[in-house]
C-alpha cells in the first residue's frame, strides 16, 4: 500500500532480565497497519501477545527498535505527549470492559472526549450519537452493573471509537462472551471498522473472529508470520 501507515514497528524487540539471564520475548518484529485495515494476531498463551500490545500502545518501551503511531515515534515522546497521542489516535477494547462502575454508559463514553478538552455539551452529543449507533440509545443512563455482558462490551467499543481514532486495538474482545453475543459483537466491529475507516488490530484465540480480518498473523518465537 502506498498510503501512510497509521501504525508501524521496525526491528521491534523486547527482553527482560531474570537474574543473570536475559529472556527475549520479541525479536526484530516488523508490522504495518494502514487506515481501515483489519489485522488479527494469534498465538499461544505466553507467546508475547500482551507484551506486543503494550509496546504498540505506548504502555511499555522496547529494548530495541521503535513504534510509530500516526507518524510519531512513541519512545521519542514525553509521557504527557504519549498520553495525548494515545487519547487522540488510539482506542482500546479489552476482554473485560474496564468501564468505570460509578459512571453511566454515557459518562463512560464521554471520558476520552473530556480528557481531550472537548466541551461537555459536545462530548455528550457525540457520545450519545455513538451509543445510539451501537444499539444502546435506550441505555444511556444505565451504569455497567445494570447492563448485560454484550451491552458492556458495546459501551467499551463506543468509548474506543468516540474520538474517531485511526486505530483501535482489541485484546480478546469476545473472550468473555457467549457465542451468540460474541457473533453480534464481531458483526458490530466489522461494520464500524468499515463505515468509520478505522484500522483494527485484534489479538484473539478465536479463529472465527481472526478469519474475518484482512490479514492473520501468528506470533511465535518472538516473530510475526502470516498464516
From Swiss-Prot:
Enzyme Commission code: 7.6.2.-
Segments crossing the lipid bilayer: none
Record PANTHER family: IMPORT ATP-BINDING PROTEIN (PTHR24220), LIPOPROTEIN-RELEASING SYSTEM ATP-BINDING PROTEIN LOLD (PTHR24220:SF689)
GO CC, alphabetical: plasma membrane
Enzyme class: translocase
Oligomeric form and interacting partners: The complex is composed of two ATP-binding proteins (LolD) and two transmembrane proteins (LolC and LolE).
Matching CDD domains: ABC_MJ0796_LolCDE_FtsE
Compartments it resides in: Cell inner membrane
Listed name of the protein: Lipoprotein-releasing system ATP-binding protein LolD
Task performed by this protein: Part of the ABC transporter complex LolCDE involved in the translocation of mature outer membrane-directed lipoproteins, from the inner membrane to the periplasmic chaperone, LolA. Responsible for the formation of the LolA-lipoprotein complex in an ATP-dependent manner.
Top-rank taxon: Bacteria
Membrane topology listed for this record: Peripheral membrane protein
Similarity comment: family membership: Belongs to the ABC transporter superfamily. Lipoprotein translocase (TC 3.A.1.125) family.
Gene3D superfamilies (UniProt xref): P-loop containing nucleotide triphosphate hydrolases (3.40.50.300)
One GO term of the biological process aspect: protein localization to outer membrane
Residue ranges of every copy of the ABC transporter domain listed in the record: 7-227
UniProt entry tagged with the keyword Thylakoid: no
Binding-site residues, ATP: 43-50
InterPro entries: AAA+_ATPase, ABC_transporter-like_ATP-bd, ABC_transporter-like_CS, ABC_transpr_LolD-like, LolD_lipo_ATP-bd, MacB-like_ATP-bd, P-loop_NTPase
Keywords: ATP-binding, Cell inner membrane, Cell membrane, Membrane, Nucleotide-binding, Translocase, Transport
GO MF annotation terms: ATP binding; ATP hydrolysis activity; transmembrane transporter activity
Gene giving rise to this polypeptide: lolD
Main location: membrane
Amino acid at each position: 500500500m502506498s498510503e501512510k501507515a497509521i501504525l508501524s514497528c521496525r526491528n521491534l524487540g523486547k527482553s527482560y532480565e531474570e537474574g543473570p539471564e536475559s529472556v527475549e520475548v520479541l525479536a526484530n518484529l516488523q508490522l504495518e497497519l494502514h487506515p481501515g485495515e483489519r489485522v488479527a494476531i494469534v498465538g499461544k498463551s505466553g507467546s508475547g501477545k500482551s507484551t506486543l500490545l503494550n509496546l504498540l500502545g505506548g504502555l511499555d518501551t522496547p529494548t530495541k527498535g521503535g513504534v510509530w503511531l500516526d507518524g510519531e515515534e512513541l519512545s521519542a515522546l514525553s509521557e504527557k505527549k504519549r498520553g495525548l497521542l494515545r487519547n487522540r489516535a488510539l482506542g482500546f477494547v479489552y476482554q473485560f470492559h474496564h468501564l468505570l462502575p460509578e459512571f453511566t454508559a454515557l459518562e463512560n463514553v464521554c471520558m476520552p472526549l473530556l480528557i481531550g478538552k472537548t466541551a461537555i455539551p459536545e462530548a455528550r452529543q457525540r457520545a450519545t450519537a455513538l451509543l445510539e449507533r451501537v444499539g444502546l440509545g435506550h441505555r444511556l443512563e444505565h451504569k455497567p452493573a445494570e447492563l448485560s455482558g454484550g451491552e458492556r462490551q458495546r459501551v467499551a467499543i463506543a468509548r474506543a471509537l468516540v474520538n474517531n481514532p485511526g486505530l483501535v486495538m482489541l485484546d480478546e474482545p469476545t473472550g468473555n462472551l457467549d457465542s451468540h453475543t460474541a457473533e453480534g459483537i464481531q458483526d458490530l466491529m466489522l461494520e464500524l471498522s468499515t463505515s468509520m475507516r478505522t484500522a483494527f488490530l485484534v489479538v484473539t484465540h478465536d479463529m472465527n473472529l481472526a478469519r474475518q480480518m484482512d490479514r492473520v498473523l501468528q506470533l511465535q518465537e518472538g516473530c510475526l508470520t502470516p498464516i
